[in-house]
């Protein structure tokens, strides 16, 4: 079974991914893949430098994410160009990892994709598992975690699709407003229901 794990910023999705890993499930991490495909020498890296110029490259040859970010944040057309370079490379790499894991005998694979809805990557997965918290909890956690001011935190939360609107397409929802133990119990119940782990685990 291919499971898409998603959530919003500061929803606690990473904690759930860690729990799934501890249960022995292989994780394909979209954020890590997105970092890997823009490493020096990779085709996406070369395409970014060709388009945006050497101003987005650090002295050590790696991408200067801050410089690139300030360009694409302000200019929608440049953001579209960047997405057209990076997104296909990420999809290809994730597909390759999926095929590799299937060849090695894995029956269940977890795709940790923060922007599963926004990137429309549903075709990769059979089930969507949404890690949910209400916006008030999300705001408090983000401010505590990143030492962010309230306005900045609200802006970052609102730049993503609201968690509330993601509930409709989720096959299962974990309410992560409580303790980690409560979250883990919900996760295990869902995985048993989906027959990913045995009933007696």
UniProtKB/Swiss-Prot annotation:
Q: Reaction catalysed by this chain? A: 3'-dephospho-CoA + ATP = ADP + CoA + H(+)
Q: Where in the cell is it found?
A: Cytoplasm
Annotated residues for binding of ATP: 10-15
Which spans of this chain does the record mark as coiled coil? none
**Which keywords appear in this protein's UniProt record, sorted alphabetically?**
ATP-binding, Coenzyme A biosynthesis, Cytoplasm, Kinase, Nucleotide-binding, Transferase
Can you tell me which family this protein belongs to?
Answer: Belongs to the CoaE family.
Name it: Dephospho-CoA kinase
Provide the species name.
Halalkalibacterium halodurans (strain ATCC BAA-125 / DSM 18197 / FERM 7344 / JCM 9153 / C-125) (Bacillus halodurans)
